[in-house]
């Protein structure tokens, strides 16, 4: 959610954070994988362009001269870029009318009883515009659509900011929630949504006096501006040239690389120095040096230069950290971390620090030292350092890629990644997931023929109806594009599930069915998963089946993980059906939202699942477990170290948003020195310690996840507990799937996450959500 926008959790785009966890201690017994009749149909819809084209033509009732039409995502307005602008203007008009109606009726009992439902409807009106505009801005191939989306975004956020300062809306909501005669007639979900919206109003400064509120708004706008600047410069370098001595350049073993660097010297426009060679930090040159060059001093210089941010970037970071500290002080919080965590699962910064500390201690014991020992042996030709301290201090960040490459050469097997890919076409994975979800949740995927205009690319995008088999009801729709050239893997919520307000007369089915897809009076969720598998470096086949040779898109194991991860989010959106939109599906606590997606990665790494799903694109042979095992061996190198590095980033995130930053305000607004904090954290935590560069200026989550970057690690720990408690014995077990669905997925954000976990794991101690609960989650984790 954007800062200062209480009425909505819009732009529900969830970026992928890839875990490297591999299921351990797995028994080799498997559940029989019986293919449903729909299996081949789903597989062909994704793998054969010819089959897909025929299916689409038949299903949409198209003729030679005409075919039924609609707009993007079945919204009748969204047929042209101007239609998007018209949709936003119509929605604005509807929103303003609804606000006027709410405030004119709030003094009546009936008006009070309907107020929260209408406030939720108002949020939904705005979200449906903002979310689709954000999607178009990021994904759509047309510049005209993108420009219209930008115009729409600005228009809607301007109105959002007006609502933020609407004291009458806030005071009416506050009075309703404080009136027991009214609240006793409201549902628990209405009260929870009302409390959530009140909290967001108050956390946005609505209850302040006018002057203080004006200052607050100015600060939040400044933070937003600085965040945009920070994001725009995230890939910048302090210098794109790294000076090294001629002797260091001579130490490069690859003559072709030396020649390439030499040829770049004429392009250097700085002051030339004798006995100095300028290494350009462009293309693959620095990465080749870090991977292949044996000189420690050369690798160190290149590594530091490659990780140094521009001075202006570090200054931008220091400033938004300072402003966040000031904002939290204005709101009477000890720190920005306290402000951020108040309504999260972790609750306090102290709980987060304890969780991270325990996790790091566990990682050191369970894998970090062992992994670093392997690197140390290679570095010292078989005679590595003796003590744990020596081993940890011995391996520098610029050693990592070089020594890892040597380790991989030593462990090189005859199995190539290409061999494994042949068992995982896109269609095979989606059809396999359909089998898994049918077994676990009694939910099925039904391919649908999209109408003309319903998708942003009629050749690429597949539409899937998600069906609850037991109830014979449609749960929602997925729009899947695995061949985008624009977007890193992402899950976009386009429309949230909710019950229409037909019973209170503020909207009609006839009016809404032009904008959304319905099941009677229920608004069905729409989710889009977008991936960029077409641009994969190892891609050797046509982008689509039916292009030239009918060979499908084949996926690496990492890409299979990606689909499983994103489908975890999608199923949360489909199953988390609520009456009100604000807490549906993935609209739950930030440090709980990754649980369903991370848990799915445990399925994608379990041989009992992946060997059943994987089938050779040509022979239909199942994936041999021995082949998978060899491929996994390469994937888990430095697994514990990678997780430890994530924990260091989470610790840095906490340190930069803690009480000390607020205390520095006494000395002046710009006293924050993020580089000093970064180097201090690195020195303290040691593993691949960086005390030289300003890499923290390249860490985008310091802005986007401010004080909650720990969330992903916490959700991995929770997912491990869920996996061990429910699925480790049999990942295809329907009873376990039902338990997880009923205790976690179906609630969206309407239930305390700790209660969900206590129910799923049968442990009442977790209900308190206190430091003890955090300790239980962190114990004996297999991260």
Curated annotation (Swiss-Prot):
Cofactor(s) this protein cannot do without: Zn(2+)
InterPro entries per the UniProt record, alphabetical: M3A_MIP, MetalloPept_cat_dom_sf, Neurolysin/TOP_dom2, Pept_M3A_M3B, Pept_M3A_M3B_dom
Residue ranges of the TM segments: none
Entry-linked PANTHER family: MITOCHONDRIAL INTERMEDIATE PEPTIDASE (PTHR11804:SF79), PROTEASE M3 THIMET OLIGOPEPTIDASE-RELATED (PTHR11804)
Gene Ontology CC entries for this record: mitochondrial matrix; mitochondrion
Protein's job: Cleaves proteins, imported into the mitochondrion, to their mature size. While most mitochondrial precursor proteins are processed to the mature form in one step by mitochondrial processing peptidase (MPP), the sequential cleavage by MIP of an octapeptide after initial processing by MPP is a required step for a subgroup of nuclear-encoded precursor proteins destined for the matrix or the inner membrane.
A Pfam family per the record: Peptidase_M3
Catalytic residues identified in the record: 566
Mitochondrion keyword on record: yes
Keywords tagged on the record: Hydrolase, Metal-binding, Metalloprotease, Mitochondrion, Protease, Transit peptide, Zinc
Broad EC category: hydrolase
PROSITE patterns recorded: ZINC_PROTEASE
Annotated transit peptide: 1-33
Top-level taxon in the UniProt lineage: Eukaryota
Organism name: Candida albicans (strain SC5314 / ATCC MYA-2876)
Catalytic reactions on record: Release of an N-terminal octapeptide as second stage of processing of some proteins imported into the mitochondrion
Ion transport listed as a keyword: no
Principal place of residence: mitochondrion
Bound cofactor: record note: Binds 1 zinc ion.
Gene Ontology BP annotations: filamentous growth of a unicellular organism; intracellular iron ion homeostasis; mitochondrial ATP synthesis coupled electron transport; peptide metabolic process; protein processing involved in protein targeting to mitochondrion; protein stabilization; single-species biofilm formation
Places the protein is found: Mitochondrion matrix
Descriptive protein name: Mitochondrial intermediate peptidase
Molecular function via GO: metal ion binding; metalloendopeptidase activity; peptidase activity
Family according to the record: Belongs to the peptidase M3 family.
GN (gene name): OCT1
């Amino acid at each position: 959610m954007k800062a200062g926008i209480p009425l909505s959790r819009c732009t529900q785009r969830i970026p992928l954070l890839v875990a490297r966890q591999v299921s351990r201690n797995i028994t080799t017994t498997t559940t029989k994988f019986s293919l449903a009749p729909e299996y081949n149909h789903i597989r062909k819809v994704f793998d054969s362009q010819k089959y897909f084209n025929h299916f689409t033509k038949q299903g949409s009732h198209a003729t030679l001269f005409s075919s039924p039409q609609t707009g993007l995502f079945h919204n009748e307005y969204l047929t042209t870029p101007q239609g998007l602008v018209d949709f936003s203007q119509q929605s604005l008009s509807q929103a303003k009318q609804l606000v006027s109606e709410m405030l004119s009726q709030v003094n009546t009992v009936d008006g009070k009883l309907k107020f929260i439902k209408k406030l939720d409807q108002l949020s939904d009106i705005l979200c449906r515009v903002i979310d689709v505009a954000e999607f178009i801005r990021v994904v759509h191939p047309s510049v005209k659509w993108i420009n219209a989306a930008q115009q729409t975004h600005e228009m809607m956020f301007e109105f959002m900011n007006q609502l933020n300062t609407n004291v009458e809306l806030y005071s009416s909501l506050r009075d309703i929630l404080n009136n027991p005669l009214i609240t006793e007639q409201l549902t628990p979900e209405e009260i929870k949504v009302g409390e959530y919206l009140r909290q967001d109003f108050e956390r946005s400064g609505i209850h302040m006096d006018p002057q203080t509120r004006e200052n607050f708004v100015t600060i939040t706008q400044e933070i937003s501006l600085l965040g945009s600047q920070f994001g725009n410069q995230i890939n910048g370098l302090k210098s794109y040239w790294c000076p090294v001595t001629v002797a260091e350049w001579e130490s490069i073993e690859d003559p072709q690389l030396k020649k390439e660097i030499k040829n770049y010297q004429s392009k250097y426009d700085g002051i030339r120095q004798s006995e100095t060679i300028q290494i350009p930090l462009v293309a693959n040159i620095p990465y080749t040096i870090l991977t292949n060059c044996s000189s420690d001093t050369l690798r160190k210089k290149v590594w530091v230069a490659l990780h140094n941010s521009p001075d202006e970037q570090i200054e931008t970071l220091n400033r938004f950290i300072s402003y966040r500290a000031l904002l939290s002080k204005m709101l009477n919080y000890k720190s920005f971390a306290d402000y951020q965590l108040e309504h999260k699962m972790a609750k306090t910064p102290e709980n987060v620090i304890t969780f991270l500390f325990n996790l790091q201690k566990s990682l050191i014991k369970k894998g970090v030292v062992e992994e670093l020992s392997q690197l140390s042996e290679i570095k010292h030709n078989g005679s590595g350092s003796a003590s744990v301290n020596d081993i940890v201090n011995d391996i520098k960040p610029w050693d990592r890629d070089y020594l890892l490459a040597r380790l991989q050469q030593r462990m090189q097997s005859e199995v190539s990644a290409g061999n494994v890919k042949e068992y995982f076409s896109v269609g095979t994975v989606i059809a396999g997931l359909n089998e898994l979800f049918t077994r676990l949740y009694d939910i099925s995927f039904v391919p649908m023929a999209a109408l003309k205009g319903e998708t942003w690319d009629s050749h690429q995008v597949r539409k899937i109806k998600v069906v609850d088999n037991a109830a014979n009801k449609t749960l929602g729709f997925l729009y899947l594009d695995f061949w985008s050239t624009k977007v890193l893997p992402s899950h976009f919520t386009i429309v949230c599930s909710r019950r229409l307000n037909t019973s209170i007369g503020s909207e009609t089915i006839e009016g809404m069915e032009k904008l959304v897809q319905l099941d009677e009076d229920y608004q069905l969720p729409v989710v889009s998963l977008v991936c960029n598998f077409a641009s994969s470096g190892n891609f050797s086949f046509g982008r689509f089946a039916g292009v030239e040779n009918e060979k499908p898109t084949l996926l690496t194991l990492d890409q299979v993980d990606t689909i499983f991860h994103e489908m975890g989010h999608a199923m949360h959106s489909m199953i988390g059906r609520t009456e009100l939109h604000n807490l549906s599906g993935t609209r739950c606590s930030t440090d709980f939202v990754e649980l369903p997606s991370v848990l799915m990665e445990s399925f994608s790494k379990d041989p009992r699942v992946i060997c059943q799903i994987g089938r050779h694109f040509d022979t239909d042979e199942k994936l041999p477990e021995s082949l998978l095992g060899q491929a996994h061996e390469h994937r888990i190198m430095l697994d514990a170290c990678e997780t430890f590095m994530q924990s260091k980033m989470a610790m840095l995130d906490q340190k930069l948003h803690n009480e000390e930053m607020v205390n520095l305000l006494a000395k002046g607004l710009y006293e924050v020195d993020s580089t000093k904090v970064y180097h201090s954290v690195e020195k303290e935590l040691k593993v691949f310690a960086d005390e030289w560069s300003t890499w923290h200026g390249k860490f985008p989550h310091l802005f986007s996840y401010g004080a909650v970057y720990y969330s992903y690690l916490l959700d991995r720990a929770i997912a491990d507990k869920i996996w061990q408690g429910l699925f480790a014995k049999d990942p295809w077990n329907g009873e376990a799937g039902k338990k997880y669905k009923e205790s976690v997925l179906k609630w969206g954000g309407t239930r305390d996450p700790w209660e969900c976990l206590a129910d799923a794991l049968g442990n009442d101690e977790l209900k308190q959500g206190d430091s003890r609960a955090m300790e239980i989650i962190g114990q004996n984790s297999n991260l």
